[in-house]
């Protein structure tokens, strides 16, 4: 089976925008009316959005942990997310 070309990167969108798009994708997939190729493309986009959302949530959680650190004397450092 030929190897598929890498899909283009998702443009950075707000978490809420990505979540809304993901909900729309789920609705279209659950309708069962999409042709197979369209359904696969929608599924692939959904997986990308989920991964982006997970990364956003992880970064937010890390920022909260830094802010709630028990060491009140520790200086706050700017949060720099890992980019992949």
Curated annotation (Swiss-Prot):
User: What does the record give as EC number?
Assistant: 3.1.11.6
In Gene Ontology terms, what is one molecular function of this protein? exodeoxyribonuclease VII activity
Q: Which reaction does it catalyse?
A: Exonucleolytic cleavage in either 5'- to 3'- or 3'- to 5'-direction to yield nucleoside 5'-phosphates
Q: Where in the cell is it found?
A: Cytoplasm
Query: What are the protein's UniProt keywords?
Result: Cytoplasm, Exonuclease, Hydrolase, Nuclease
Keyword Nuclease applies: yes
For this entry, the protein name equals Exodeoxyribonuclease 7 small subunit
* Organism field: Yersinia pseudotuberculosis serotype O:3 (strain YPIII)
């Amino acid at each position: 089976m030929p190897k598929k070309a890498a899909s283009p990167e998702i443009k950075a969108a707000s978490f809420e925008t990505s979540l809304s798009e993901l909900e729309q994708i789920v609705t279209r997939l659950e309708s069962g009316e999409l042709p197979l190729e369209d359904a696969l493309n929608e599924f692939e986009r959904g997986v990308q959005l989920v991964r982006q959302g997970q990364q956003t949530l992880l970064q937010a959680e890390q920022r909260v942990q830094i802010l709630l650190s028990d060491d009140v004397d520790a200086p706050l450092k700017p949060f720099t997310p890992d980019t992949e």
